[in-house]
Amino acid sequence: MNSSNNLYALENPEIENAFFFRQALNAISTPGKIFDLSCNLNTPNGLSKSAGSLLLCLCDFDTPIFLSETFNTDEIRKWITFHTNSNFTEKGNCKFALGNWEELLPFEKYQLGTDAYPDRSATLIINYEKISNNGTKLFGPGIKNYTYFNLPDEEKFKNNNSL
């Protein structure tokens, strides 16, 4: 574990999980804004506190998860199973996918959802070290005026929008 050898991820689960959930909602509703999830979350080696907090507050026994090769370790699988009771699956059947950018491609392998049921699409939790507010200009719903965000591959995002 990163912070300690304690199996339990949170010291105050109700309060900390509410904080994570609020931060996740803020991030989803304001695309391109960077949120700091500083916390005392105990995660296994290789799993960031940000990714771990998202998994804890968004996944449960009814949430199939895909783990890319880097994250598909016994330690990470056991931690996710212990805290969420989620099961693991392939890209095409997951509700959440965790991985590095290149390992999660291509986007076409994931469930897309529809206009009527957008919740049926997969959510990708991308481990990306070089996050910053410069690069591609973003605008649209949830963004006042515009913002900038360094996307790993702008063309892949544009192509994904047309799926």
State where each predicted segment sits:
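N-terminal, charge-rich interaction modules
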Residues: 1-64, 68-71, 82
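Internal, well-folded beta-alpha domain core
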Residues: 74-163
